[in-house]
Amino acid sequence: MQDGKIALVTGAGSGVGRAAAVTLARDGWHVVAVGRRTDPLAETVAECEREGGSGSAVTADVSDPASVETLFERVRADHGRLDLLFNNAGTAAPPVPVDELDVEQWQRVVDVNLTGSFLCARQAFGLMKTQDPSGGRIINNGSVSAHVPRLHSAPYTATKHAITGLTKSLSLDGRPFGITCGQIDIGNASTPLTARMPEGVLQADGSIRPEPTMDAADVGRAVAYMASLPPDANVLTMTVMANGMPFIGRG
């Protein structure tokens, strides 16, 4: 159990973020649930409490530096420390050929997936380095697309590859301060973003075929395991995916 420890989960209003928040709360973490919409965050906190845990909701836009700074100022004021950051917030662009993609669509994915993770990690480092005792853990939400792309997914795939570089850099930079960083690469968790998969999605050969999904709660348990390790151990990378999905052999 992680009684008394503070976890911050971005994108906590639904899907993997909510699943991770609830599992962490069940394990004794106090979860700061972060997202852009108030009502879904309130539902996440209520579910944390139904599971016997505790949580609080904070609205913030991870792509906005000022919003992220305000978020972490509140964490410092309310809790005095941060033991875990789960950089989960993410988005994707329409699945169109790259020459049909608007620059604004590209930029939005970069702003949320990559810059948002950087902004939160930057603030977390500042808090984790100076708190007493110092140290903490960051877990970044990557994707199986950090290894193998889908067709028409340039913004998403590029940002998830970049998350891998960010994860490794943070892991190295955090060593002197007891800050660990790892990455969970997820494939086809059942969330609003993957709702279309059982009906059929575009494959590398141009065909449309259904794909299996897995319960997001399984990902929540994986995140909680990574978070539960002692300070002298770290899962640098973990891949968890729906059994039978086209990943190995994809393309």
Identify the function of each model-found stretch:
Residues 13-15:
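Conserved glycine-rich cofactor-binding loop
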Residues 29-43:
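Conserved glycine-rich Rossmann-like NAD(P)H-binding loop of the short-chain dehydrogenase/reductase
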Residues 59-71, 103:
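The beta1-alpha1 cofactor-binding region of Rossmann-like NAD(H)/NADP(H)-dependent oxidoreductases
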Residues 96-98, 105-107:
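Substrate-binding pocket helix/loop in short-chain dehydrogenase/reductase
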Residues 121, 159:
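Active-site helix of classical SDR
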Residues 143:
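Residue(s) in the substrate-gating loop at a strand-loop-helix junction
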Residues 183-184, 202-248:
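C-terminal helical subdomain
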